[in-house]
A protein has these predicted regions:
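Serine-dependent amide/ester hydrolase catalytic core
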Residues: 1-62
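Structural helix-boundary/capping segments
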Residues: 67-138
Length: 138
């Protein structure tokens, strides 16, 4: 029932808040979670795939949704591939997601700013490659 689903979601959120991403007075979040959001792999629309299976209802990308913690997508590069449609080298984004304790969105923004200042990652600009700086045609 809906009531059971809400109870399960609340239990999961409380567990994450109490055991995984705990609020810390000095650092805001006592830990960070990092997972690959997009690995830059192709997924052609004109390819036949296996039929859908039974959904599990959960993946790493659902932690934020079910617990209410921030999930920040951070583009870190791009992967080249030869398109079987255009027969040219094209690029797909590669990104990681960073999770922190509830209410620590600002801490993640600060971390990203520090990484840009240190030259670890590039600042992003809509419509341009984060690696080469070239304009991307959509």
């Amino acid at each position: 029932t809906i009531k059971d689903a809400i109870a399960n979601k609340t239990t999961f959120g409380n567990w994450i808040e109490d055991n995984v991403f705990v609020v810390n007075e000095q650092t805001c979040s006592d830990s960070l979670g990092i997972y690959v959001g997009n690995s830059g792999t192709t997924n052609y629309r004109n390819a036949y795939r296996n039929p859908p299976g039974i959904p599990t209802g959960f993946s790493t990308s659902r932690i934020s949704i079910f617990s209410g913690v921030p999930d920040f997508v951070l583009p870190i590069g791009q992967a080249a591939y030869v398109s079987n449609i255009t027969q040219q080298t094209e690029y797909l984004p590669v990104s990681v997601d960073i999770l922190a304790a509830k209410g620590c969105d600002g801490m993640i923004f600060g971390l990203v700013q520090d990484l840009v200042k240190a030259g670890v990652i590039n600042a992003t600009k809509a419509g341009y490659s984060g690696v080469t700086g070239e304009k991307i045609l959509f």
